Amino acid sequence: MLKVILKKEIDSEKFLQEIKKRLIEDKGYKGLIIDGEGDFTYRAADDYEGACYFSYASWLSHRKTEQTENGDVLYFGIIPSKKKRLTKEVYSFFHTHFSRFLLSCFDHHIKDIVISADINQEIDIILNPQKRIGD
């Protein structure tokens, strides 16, 4: 999971809208889903450019936003296309490439990005959705 800490003056909702726009318009992602609470999930594109960010993982998910006095904190994760593809390599690939995407496009909005240290815990959360943050 990626924990993205925004600069204090950055509005998290506007930031999420910018990410949506950039992923859909510039990266060719498709299948935008917005759930009842405003979270969103993207289906990765079939082309190389879209797929390169996620390898075998097919979905990017914004899981939660926390508002703190030092700036909003957003949590991102992935939902693999097949549970057998839940490997440390897939998560490492996601962390590396999605972090690069965020920093290359939105460095001026971001204070810090923290990568989940416990990949096994993240895999457990995906396999057991009731353990997700915010649930």
Language-model features: locations:
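Short secondary-structure junctions
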Residues: 27-34, 53-56, 105-109
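Short, low-complexity, polar/charged sequence segments that are solvent-exposed and flexible
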Residues: 23-27, 61, 94-99
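Compact, well-ordered interaction domains used in eukaryotic information-processing assemblies
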Residues: 46-61
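Ampiphathic alpha-helical segments that act as solvent-exposed interaction surfaces
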Residues: 19, 80-114
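Short, highly charged C-terminal tails/helix-capping segments
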Residues: 107-135
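Negatively charged, low-complexity tracts enriched in Asp/Glu with abundant Ser/Thr
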Residues: 1-49
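Intrinsically disordered, low-complexity regulatory segments enriched in Ser/Thr/Pro
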Residues: 57-92
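A structural detector for beta-sheet-dominated domains
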Residues: 5-9, 43-45, 79, 104, ...
